[in-house]
């Protein structure tokens, strides 16, 4: 095959010269020469050679826009260079046009990631052996210049093959803030967990951080790391949410008008005969110190959320009933995967959360679900998205990381009044309750802590929040694996992220157009 591709231009040149000489001889001959068998044979041979040459030229000029051709050349070409190295991939940029990925072939760097490893999971990588992932994969054709009209392809690849020029790809602009990604990487350093930030006013995703991180140019070692750095915990990590899940029960209670007093005795609440009681964290704290705790007594929803009372919400679940709980959870679409980016070659989708079937379930399932334990598993992204709904007066915008996407209102899971009431309760959690550490950010906020029991080890630390309290511009979810109390590990990280978001202008009012990249 190789001799054929190399010999075609030579054969074509010989044929062209032969036709030119023959035409010149015939034009100088006074007597017409009738076509003979040799002339017909040469014409057929010429037509065949031209057809082969045209077929080969079409592959050379436009083949690289075909993924099958690229794969074929990568496997069978004897050249030491990967075909992709002949392509100057477009850049991946953040909302401020800061470069998150670019090609630097002259410096010996086919792909360079200036903010690495801060956004490694979402930006992805390009590797000659392991392929592509993340945005690099989902938008492959766009980044390599293979998307667009056929005329554009032919012109671009014709220039590459005939003049040996570099094929220039197209840029991709994201809604992420690279500086916030770097701050999240610093805050999560040495830990396992994730942080997600969404603009509730538009659905634009500002932060998708997962830890531990990996080196985008050294993929092999990361794949065998027992800490699973290749796992995108922000989108695909499933965790019991603990007390952060109480925001859904609170929303259902507000909507149903069941926010009154429930007795929360020190001995707790048992969901059935022979089952261990569900107790409040103060009971265990006092027990460790050898003191007797009197319990919360009769408290309402506001106090229960501020104090994060497990007993209150464990009893609230059966009081609301399976149907009411199911309806509220369905409104937030927790069990549906969410597509965040649709590119030229694929999409990026957040994993769906897992919830038990509540209809017909025993009381113990309702109580465990009400406090975010049992069979409940959620992703950090889904929790950030839920808080964004509360922050946006009950409206749910389509989450996206493509800066070219126009904000799209999907639904309204909550009424404006329910969302407003719940926000006020979450603000009290920060000013009076378990989320007081959030005040260190210097920005007013509302939130909810969570300490999720983990059968495999220490409890997971959660915190979800929105800020500023008066006009929410960002919704955040943070989880730290084995971090203990939410107020201990997750809250300080969320506070630092809100402070950084304020510094980077993410909390500023939207422009008059009503949208921002």
Segments predicted by a language model, with ranges:
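Periplasmic/cell-envelope proteins involved in peptidoglycan metabolism and beta-lactam response
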Residues: 1-222, 229, 233-238, 243, ...
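Beta-lactam-recognizing serine transpeptidase/beta-lactamase-like catalytic domain environment
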Residues: 7, 96, 159-160, 201-243, ...
């Amino acid at each position: 095959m190789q001799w054929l591709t190399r010999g075609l231009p030579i054969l074509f040149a010989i044929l062209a010269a032969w036709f030119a000489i023959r035409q010149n001889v015939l034009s100088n001959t006074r007597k017409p020469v009738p076509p003979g068998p040799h002339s017909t044979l040469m014409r057929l041979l010429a037509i065949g050679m031209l057809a082969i040459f045209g077929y080969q030229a079409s592959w050379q000029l436009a083949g690289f826009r075909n993924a099958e051709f690229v794969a074929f050349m990568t496997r069978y070409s004897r050249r030491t260079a990967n075909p992709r190295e002949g392509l100057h991939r477009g850049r991946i940029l953040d909302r401020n046009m800061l470069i998150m990925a670019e090609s630097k072939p002259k410096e010996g760097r086919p792909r360079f990631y200036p903010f690495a490893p801060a956004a490694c999971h979402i930006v992805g990588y390009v590797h000659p052996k392991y392929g592509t992932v993340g945005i690099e994969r989902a938008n492959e054709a766009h980044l390599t210049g293979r998307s667009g009209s056929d005329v554009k392809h032919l012109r671009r690849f014709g220039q590459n093959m005939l003049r040996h020029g570099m094929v220039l790809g197209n840029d991709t602009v994201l809604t992420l803030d690279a500086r916030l990604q770097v701050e999240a990487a610093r805050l999560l350093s040495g830990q396992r967990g994730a942080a997600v930030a969404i603009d509730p006013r538009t659905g634009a995703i500002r932060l998708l951080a997962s830890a531990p991180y990996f080196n985008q140019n050294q993929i092999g070692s990361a794949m065998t790391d027992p800490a699973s750095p290749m796992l995108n915990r922000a989108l695909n990590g499933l965790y019991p949410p603990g007390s952060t899940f109480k925001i859904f029960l609170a929303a259902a209670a507000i909507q149903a008008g069941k926010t009154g007093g429930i007795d929360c005795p020190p001995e707790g609440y048992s969901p059935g005969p022979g089952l261990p009681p569900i107790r409040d964290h103060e009971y265990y704290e006092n027990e460790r110190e050898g003191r007797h705790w009197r319990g919360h007594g009769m408290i309402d929803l506001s106090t229960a959320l501020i104090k994060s009372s497990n007993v209150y919400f464990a009893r609230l679940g059966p009081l609301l009933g399976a149907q009411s709980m199911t309806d509220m959870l369905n409104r937030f679409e927790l069990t549906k995967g969410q597509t965040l980016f649709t590119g030229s070659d694929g999409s990026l989708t957040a994993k769906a959360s897992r919830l038990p079937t509540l209809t017909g379930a025993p009381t113990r399932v309702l109580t465990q679900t009400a406090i975010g334990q049992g069979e409940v598993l959620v992703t950090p992204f889904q929790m950030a998205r839920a808080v964004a709904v509360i922050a946006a007066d009950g409206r749910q915008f389509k989450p996206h990381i493509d800066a070219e996407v126009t904000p799209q209102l999907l639904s309204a899971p909550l009424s404006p009044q329910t969302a407003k009431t719940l926000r006020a309760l979450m603000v009290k959690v920060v000013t009076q309750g378990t989320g007081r550490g959030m005040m260190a950010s210097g920005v007013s906020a509302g939130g909810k802590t969570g300490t999720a029991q983990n059968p495999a080890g220490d409890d997971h630390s959660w915190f979800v929040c929105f800020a500023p309290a008066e006009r929410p511009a960002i919704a955040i979810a943070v989880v730290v694996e084995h971090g203990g109390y939410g107020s201990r590990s997750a809250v300080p990280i969320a506070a630092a992220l809100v402070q950084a978001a304020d510094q980077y202008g993410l909390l500023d009012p939207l422009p008059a157009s009503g949208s921002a990249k």
